[in-house]
Amino acid sequence: MIDEYKQRGRSGHMKLRASRTNFELFRPNSRLCDIDKKFCVDYGVWLQSEYLNPQGKVIAQSTAFSYFWYLGIILSRACQKGYIKNNPWKLLSDHEKIRQPEGKREFLTLEEINKLENTPYKKDNIRRAFLFACYCGLRVGDVMGLRWSDISVNGGRHFISVVMQKNSKPISLPLPAKALSWLPESREQDAPIFALPSYTTIRKHLQKWAEDAGLDKHLHFHLSRHTYGTMLITAGVDLYTASKMIGHADVRPTQIYAKIIDKKKEEAVSLIDKVF
C-alpha cells in the first residue's frame, strides 16, 4: 500500500510508514487478521495516553487523530483488496473514535486569492495546483494523484471523479470554470495532471510564492480546502450540499465553515458600531 501511494504520487505514504511503525510499538508482530474492534479502540487510547513524541511528551490531539484515521484507511483498503473479510473500523461508534480538534480554520479572502492569481511563480505547476484546489476543495493527496482520466464531461459540464485518499470513498464533483482555468494545457491521460514534487517541497514553494504576493499567511493545502468550504457557505450553499461537495461524511465538519462566516459577520457589525 505504501508503494502504491508513492507510485500514484500521493502524499500519505509517509504517514502510512509511520503508522506501520506505530503498530509495531503498540502491538509487536500484529497481523491484519488480529485487528478487531477492541484493537482499534485500544490503539486510540494508546495514541492519546502512552505514545510519546521524540521529546518524550504525549503527542498532540491532532497528531493522534491523524494516526488513528490512517488505521481506518488501511483497514478500508485491506477490505477492498480482500485481505480481510470484514472491516472492524465500521463497528466503532463516534465516541470510540479520536475526534479531530476544531482548532482555528483560516481561509483566503477573495482579495488574497486575486493577489496570488496575479503573482507568477517559477514553479507554475505548484501555483496552478494550489489555485485549482481553492476552487474545488480537493485534499493535497488527491490533487497529487489526479489524472486527466479522472475528469469527464457530461452535458457540457466538467466533472472530477476520484477515490479520496483519506477515507477511500469515491466522490464526483462538478468543476467550476475558475477551477478549469488553472488546469495545465498538457493532457496525457495516464500522467499526473500537475506532476507535483513531495509535499515538503510543495510547502516551501507555497510559502515563497505567498511572500512574493505580499501575503502574511502560511500557504498550505488545508488552507485552499478551507477557502473552498468558506466560499460555498458564503455563496449560500446549504450545509448538506456543501458537505457533499467538500467530501465530508456528514455536516458536522462543514458547520465549522458556517461558524467562521457567522463570526466574520459579528466582527463586521462590531466595526460598524465603533464607527457610528
Where are these regions (language model features)?
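N-terminal DNA-binding recognition helix of tyrosine site-specific recombinases/integrases
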Residues: 22-23, 30-35, 53-91, 139-141
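Conserved tyrosine-mediated DNA breakage-rejoining catalytic core shared by Y-recombinases
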Residues: 91-94, 136, 145-182
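Short, polar N-cap/turn motifs at the start of nucleic acid-interacting alpha helices
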Residues: 150-157, 216, 237-256
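DNA breakage-rejoining catalytic core of tyrosine-based enzymes
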Residues: 33, 84-86, 98-115, 167-177, ...
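Active-site/catalytic core of tyrosine-dependent DNA strand-transfer enzymes
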Residues: 174-216
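Long, amphipathic, Lys/Arg-enriched alpha-helical "connector/arm" segment
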Residues: 98-125, 135-138, 146
